Amino acid sequence: GGGSIVWLDSENVLKVGPGSAGADPGPVAYGRGGDQPTVTDCFVATGLIAPQSFLGGRMTLDRSGALEALAVLGAGLGFHGVDCSEQVADSALRVTTAMMSAQLYKELAQRGVDPRGRYLVAFGGAGPTMAVPLAEEAKLGGVLIPLSPGTLCAFGAIKSRVRRDFVRSV
C-alpha cells in the first residue's frame, strides 16, 4: 500500500516493503513524524499526487519533506543533486510495480487465467494510483476503479463471514 516503506538493504539495493508506516505516523509527506520514505512519498515526489489537493484539499502534503527523505536513499545509491529524489521515487515505483506484477502473474498462473482481456479492479487508498502501471506491466485489458476505492476493503471486511477455527494438538 501507500504506507509501504522504501529502503536500502545491506548491499544498497532499493527495496519496498514489507514494513509500513501505516497512517500514523504515516509517510514523511504527512508531516506527522514519519521519517522513512514510503510509496506515498514517491507519488508526491513524482507528481502523481498533488500535495495541495490530497483528500480533496483537506490535507496538504509536505513535498519537500518527501524529497529530503528520498534524497537520503539517493545518497546511498550514489545519486547526487536535486533530481536524485525523483529518480529514487521513480525507481521505487518501478520496483513496486514489478513486485505486484510478479505476484499477480503467479496468482493468474495458478488459476490458469490468461490476463489479456481481463480487468484489474483497483481498491484501497493507493490502489488506483498503482493500477494503470500494474495493468500495463501484467498485460491486462484495463482497469476498473470503483466510486469509493478507499472504502472497498472496509466494506469487504464488514460483509465477510466471521469464522473461528479451534485446533488442538493430540
Regions found by a protein language model. Name each.
Residues 1-170:
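N-terminally biased helix-coil "hinge/interface" segments that flank
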